[in-house]
Amino acid sequence: MLAEILIAYIVALLINKHKSKSILVLGIVIHVGLLCVFKYTDFIVSNINSLFNTNLSLLRLAIPIGISFYTFQILSYEIDVYRGKVKVQRNLLKLATYVTLFPQLIAGPIVRYETIEKELDERKETKEDFAYGVTRFTTGLAKKVLIANMLGELCKVFLNGTEKSVAFYWIYGIAYALQIYFDFSAYSDMAIGLGRMFGFHFLENFNYPYISKSITEFWRRWHISLSSRFK
């Protein structure tokens, strides 16, 4: 992580100085390459061994915590610097703070640099924000423990059952869909709550996606911090 932060710091400074798309592409290749090395090398090697009956050794690299999320954040920062949406951060410590914000590091939401750019310099903690943060975190924790986990256990019961009917598949499908939503949105709620306690205002990550009337609308409402990257 420290190496990636340093790379992002240097790449962003070079992008800001030279306005070069080539430097941006180089930065993207480096960060995505590191992500693939840590997450997918052993998967690729295992498949090669299976397909060609080889005995290549697995690297068994320890995957850095939150690598997917902080890679997306670094990429969005470098892209926004290139587009001129944000000023380049010349303070390495503040850039590191942005990348390593612990509330959302593991499960999101993916926080754009422009969202907290000012708060890195002039963050204010208030009683109202702290109270809201506690409430939001508690709500997320309850969604995870009382709803998502229970739905997960229900799905296990269905999978281990012997009777497989049309009604079974309907109930299982609905339970599984709700489990995914409550599990993921619970982590986002907890991250938003923790961030608010420390004076950071993260954007919402879910907006009732299951009431969507189209795939496009669903995409806009589900994992908003990711889908907004492609606009």
Language-model features: locations:
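Membrane-embedded transmembrane alpha-helical bundles that form the catalytic cores
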Residues: 1-231
